[in-house]
């Protein structure tokens, strides 16, 4: 198991290229199950979860090969079982459920794992698929689903679930008749999945709105598709510029998809602008100011940026309040930031952050993916040395983050614990 050792206090200056989106790539790769012809994906990040997904696809009968940032998938002899040994490490593995039911009429998927940041129940997925004709039972830790042929249905989500929207979107492409997803997730990654499915021959309208209509088709063909840039990785690097007092140019950076984050960072005293070369981020003269953040489904402030922005709040003048509305138990990074000198108090789903003059390096432990990123950011700004342990969480969502940061002036080394 590795850790990161960070020598803080260095302003970051230079250019960083934003990788492809993990949260877009995972469902799109799972959608390979739906196609009957070879597929080629470009701009794919080399992450643990992506490698796990490729292994899972190969076991399911869709051999997947990585070369550079390209993944090639050859759907052939499909099998219905997603085994526990792979599924236990990754929550997104449940996304193979809808495609398997659509193609084979059966699926045997182990209950998934991933970050421990709340319940994230799969019940919404199962209830919706049942409306399309699927039947489920739980047996020895496996979700076993069966259907003759999925039928189009009108499905209303009580909450705009991203994973549920993606699973049903994929399943509905091969269902008989029309499926309507109401109160659907509007996240850019859902839109990217829909665009990919359309490139394969699916008939989808309304993606990016709260009502998506899918007209089932008999089959999907292959295509070549470029994965969208990772808005959360990009947002993390924007915060890195602000927290270190540096100046970074992000190439391949999404803009509209980051609007809610950019508005808050600018309100805190950063200057972020779109240029012909990319997105430029730096701290304005006058220092950082506190602000309030409430996490919401897209187009609101993303829960996946909450921990990173909280690190910035720790060094901002005044008081900031974070209200977490998406996941319970997503303040596990707070105690570690407090170890570094932060002044944070938690009350239910709210955290009150009072800015301090400096953070001090300390040994800290990552609890989930985005908490890991917040601790790295805090370490970049801290006086002294920070040891971030259990960075296997970090490797699930960031493509060798220490190499990208070191290229713009950071002093980070990876060591075995």
Swiss-Prot record:
Any one Gene Ontology BP term: cell division
CDD domains registered for this protein in UniProt: UdpNAET (cd01555)
Binding site residues for UDP-N-acetyl-alpha-D-glucosamine: 91, 120-124, 304, 326
Molecular functions per Gene Ontology: UDP-N-acetylglucosamine 1-carboxyvinyltransferase activity
Presence of the UniProt keyword Transmembrane helix in the record: no
Name of one Pfam family that matches: EPSP_synthase
Gene Ontology CC, one term: cytoplasm
InterPro entries reported in the protein's UniProt record: Enolpyruvate_Tfrase_dom, Enolpyruvate_Tfrase_sf, MurA_subfamily, RNA3'P_cycl/enolpyr_Trfase_a/b, UDP_GlcNAc_COvinyl_MurA
Localization annotation: Cytoplasm
Keywords: Cell cycle, Cell division, Cell shape, Cell wall biogenesis/degradation, Cytoplasm, Peptidoglycan synthesis, Pyruvate, Transferase
Active site: 115
Family according to the record: Belongs to the EPSP synthase family. MurA subfamily.
PANTHER family: UDP-N-ACETYLGLUCOSAMINE 1-CARBOXYVINYLTRANSFERASE
Protein name: UDP-N-acetylglucosamine 1-carboxyvinyltransferase
Species annotation: Nitratidesulfovibrio vulgaris (strain DP4) (Desulfovibrio vulgaris)
High-level lineage: Bacteria, Pseudomonadati, Thermodesulfobacteriota, Desulfovibrionia, Desulfovibrionales
